[in-house]
Amino acid sequence: MEKVAELRLRMSEVPPLEDEEDFFNNDQTLVRFLKAREWNVDDAEMLLKSTVEHRRSTKPLHMDCHWCHERPGHHSMRQVGFDESGRPVIYSSFAQASTHKNTVEDSVTHCTYLIENAKRTMGIGTSTWVWIIDCSGMTLTACNPKLGYGVTQVMSNHYPERLGLVICLNHNPVFQGVWKAIKVFLHPNTVAKMKLVRSKDKYLRLFQTYFDDELTNWLMEEIRLNKSKPLSKTQIEFWNPPDEQSKHDPRGCSSYITKFIDSFDRSHSSLTHRPHPNILGSLSGTVRTVSMSSEEQREREGLLSEHSNLVTDQEKTGNISDEDHDDSVVELEISPEFRIPVSEQSASKLS
């Protein structure tokens, strides 16, 4: 605790943040930043001071994703429940996203909104979250190393030691090509938190290891429905409850919905957990109706058509073995706007 006390002393002259006066004085924050820099006080101080100024300028507690308000489903990433340890579980589906033409700015904004609100659901002793990435429906437009790098950079620099586990499923060699480009910038500890699984049996066992029956069953059904073609209206509009109460609810598992959606009080929204922006819009009846452009529709229907030979029938049905294509990586020709900046190529690895 000596280094924690030293870091706290070094931060004593920093003006407090509005609405979160104890952000950089509490033990949990100090320990997270020290762990992220392998207990080097100088490096932890630099990182924490940078984060304080970042929060001072961006005001993340009040951040909202206007992209989702302007185009419902712009991001599908949303909290859907908790794991057995009480960690918030985030689920994202490429098939459900209304566009795959994302930028670093809109992706970072949405991720920040989610993380800040997920923090409000964490119990005492919980500091990390779980992210499930369902790659069904992933198109070539979404294969953007620069986007992935930009998001991981912000998360690593300003939310260190927050990511507990990433489960990536239904991916194909195209995704692995993007992952290969990104992971060289990540700390080995971060890479170790990433689990890539294709086999339905394997990700079921993984879910059963970390989640209770309720969330496991919800995830398995959500994943199954998001592999359907065409995608049903209920799954496309994942922010709305199903027409029939007995049907699967794409907003999340029932315990999460009961506690954080059905009981949501807009008058206290600045102090409490806010679910996905479009779920909030659905509650107030303010979600806009936006149709998918013909260009995006063609891209969806063609699902990686340029590399269709890489997507087997087994992959489409979820029955592929993880042993198949484990080392298969597609070398993509990345357009300049999607490439990771050359100036970052020699940057230190992110933790």
Protein language model regions, located:
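Basic, amphipathic alpha-helical/coil surface patches used to engage anionic, phosphate-bearing ligands
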Residues: 1-351
